[in-house]
Structure formats: C-alpha cells, structure tokens
Regions:
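Short active-site-adjacent structural elements
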Residues: 98-99, 258-262, 283-286, 324-326
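Helix-rich interaction surfaces within compact, conserved domain-sized segments
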Residues: 119-121, 129, 297-312
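C-terminal edge-of-domain segments
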Residues: 194-202, 206-210, 304-339
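Glycine-rich, anion-gripping cofactor-binding loops and their flanking helix/strand elements
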Residues: 40-60, 287-304
Length: 339
C-alpha cells in the first residue's frame, strides 16, 4: 500500500510522523512546506494544481494534516470516479480527529480512518449513511472480498435501498454467516444483489458482485498470438455466460511456459500465469475430454481441463476449441461471509 502525506506546519509534521509510525507497513512519502522539509519530508511543489495531480493518480491514499477545506481544494480538480479515486483523509494538526473525505468504501478511506484513529487515540469521523446506521455497505463489502462491482449506479441504488428496508440477496456460493442488516434472502424483486461469476439477472435491476475465482486452462499451438488466444477465451466464457471479471489466472502445461502469445495475453488481462508438469496434470482427478494426439505431444491426455482444475474445485467450462486454442474454466472454492 502506498500513500502521500501532506503537512503544512511544524506541529502538523509531528502528527505526520505519528501517522507514518502507525502505518509502518505502508510506503509513505511525506510532504511539507520547504522551511520544514527535513527527516525525509519532501518540499511541496508549486503551482499546486500541477503538483498534486500526478500524485493523486499514483497513490492509494492521500492523507492531509490540515483543514478539510484545504484538502478539498487541492484534490477537487483531479477527481475522476469513485471506482478509481484514491482514499482521501484529513487529520487536524493535533491528531485528534481522522476524517475520511473521499472514497470511504471502494477506496478504503473509512477503514483506514478507523485504523489510524485506533492507533493514534483519535476519533474517526465517519459520515457515510450505511456505516452510521449499521446497514450493509455493498461497495465496502465488495472491495474487502475481492469482488468486482458490475454497476456503480446500481451499487448506489442498493446503498440507498438498504437504508429503507431489506434488499433481496442471492448467491451462487455458500453463505456461511448470517446476512447483515439491509439484506434478506430472495431470488426476485425490483432491485437485488447477486453474487456469482455468471452474467445472470434474477432481479429486475440486478447488482452483480463478481468474485475473482475462475481459473482458465489454456492449450495452444506454438506461436499462437495474443489476440487469437483472447478471442478463444472470450468466446468460451461468453458461451457459458461467465463474466470475464471473474477470471484470476491462466494455467497450462510447462511446455508453454515461454509461449509469447500466452504470456502477453496474461499480462494485458492482469492474470497470473501458472504452468504445471505433465505429472502434475495427470494427478488431477476428474472426467476429462481425452486426446491421443495431445497425449503424444505433451504426455497428458488433456491440458486445458486439467490445468484449469489443478487448483480449483468445479469445472465450469469443458474443453472448447477455436483457431488452434483450447480453453477450459474452473472455479475455486469460495464462500460468502459477512463480519
């Protein structure tokens, strides 16, 4: 985690040092006025608009030891989206109050404020309605559980609806704790929350929360390019109604560990790449689509299905083939939990 920390007075710098001690596992760059710039503090640059902009887009949190007004004026020109803006927090220079100003849920500002307040002996000033009313916060839960939010406008609608009553909730994964206030089991209604990897819409307006638990198994001819692999994967997922945001990994046999097109596909899609030996793939249990030709080349009767299941639980997509690329997909074990 990385953050930029801003202080504008000598006393503010003292509080900034306490913040850095509290967040010792963070990568934090502190800034202050040039006359106070010492002990690792970098001088604030000018003009302000040009100085804060690049920092805003490069950190996960911006922490101001200042007035709220100063912080708001400095970050306002750089706001883009609640999906991408960093957490913005303000502390008074005595470190008595910690105020999350921006990205309280998706950016994690609320949780960071609570953690800082506990460490500093300060008061976290939380103003988001779901938090102060003890209701389910859909965007915070999604971030904490590694789920993509399919629609931010619908997330906003759900956040408003849980303040008025219970919103129906449906999950393809086992729910192993009680539902929080604001959610109730249901599979129909005007507005509801669905947790799963499929692009299903059980409610008239369905907010889909997509856990990243799908592992691809990919086989391909030598020299297959990135776009051919992407087209084969997208076709296989679309045919089974699987949201691409659910994919976390692509796996294959170790003979493909240097396959440029496959590696390029993984990089561009933000996927980890895993490669297994023929012995490791043969050890995977299940019913697979065999190929004597593949076995003669690789030593194992099926690469894509076995690779997908090597560290997963349920095969979602059996072997599909397109343009010399074979694709399978499997889901890891996953559970829905509410604190």
């Amino acid at each position: 985690m990385n953050a930029a920390l801003f202080a504008y007075s000598r006393r503010g710098c003292a509080t900034a040092r306490r913040i850095m001690a509290a967040l010792a596992d963070w990568d934090i760059q502190p800034y202050t006025m040039e006359r106070f710039a010492e002990d690792g503090f970098a001088p604030l640059g000018r003009p302000a608009r040009e100085f804060y902009g690049p920092i805003f887009g490069d950190v996960q949190a911006m922490i101001f030891v200042s007035s709220v007004g100063l912080a708001v004026r400095e970050v306002a020109p750089h706001l883009k989206s609640k999906a991408t803006d960093p957490a913005v927090l303000v502390l008074d220079e005595l470190g008595q109050y910690v105020i999350p100003v921006l990205s309280g849920h998706i950016g994690g500002a609320n949780e960071l404020a609570k953690a800082l307040a506990a460490s500093l002996g300060a008061q976290a000033v939380i103003t988001t309605a779901t938090d102060i009313n003890g209701r389910f916060s859909v965007d915070a839960w999604a971030v904490q559980n590694g789920c993509a939010i399919a629609s931010l406008p619908l997330a906003k609608a759900v956040s408003a609806a849980v303040l008025e009553g219970d919103v129906p909730f449906l999950s393809d994964f086992p729910v192993v704790t009680d539902l929080p206030r604001g959610l109730a089991p249901g599979d129909a209604g005007a507005l509801g929350v669905y947790v799963g990897v499929y692009e299903k819409t059980p409610f008239a307006k369905t907010l889909r929360l997509v856990p990243r638990v799908v592992r691809l198994g990919i086989g391909c001819r030598k020299g297959t390019d990135e776009e051919t692999i992407r087209a084969a994967v997208n076709e296989a997922l679309a045919a089974h109604g699987i949201d691409r945001r659910a994919v976390k990994c692509a796996a294959s046999i170790d003979l493909k560990a240097e396959e440029a097109g496959l590696l390029a596909y993984c990089r561009s899609e933000g996927l980890s790449a895993e490669f297994y030996t023929a012995d490791e793939l043969r050890a995977v249990r299940g019913e697979f689509t065999p190929s004597e030709f593949v076995k003669s080349i690789t030593g194992v009767d099926n690469v894509c299905e076995r690779a997908a299941l090597r560290n997963a639980e349920t095969l979602l997509v059996k072997k599909t083939a397109r343009s010399g690329v074979t694709v399978a997909a499997a889901a890891e074990h996953w559970e829905v939990r509410f604190a």
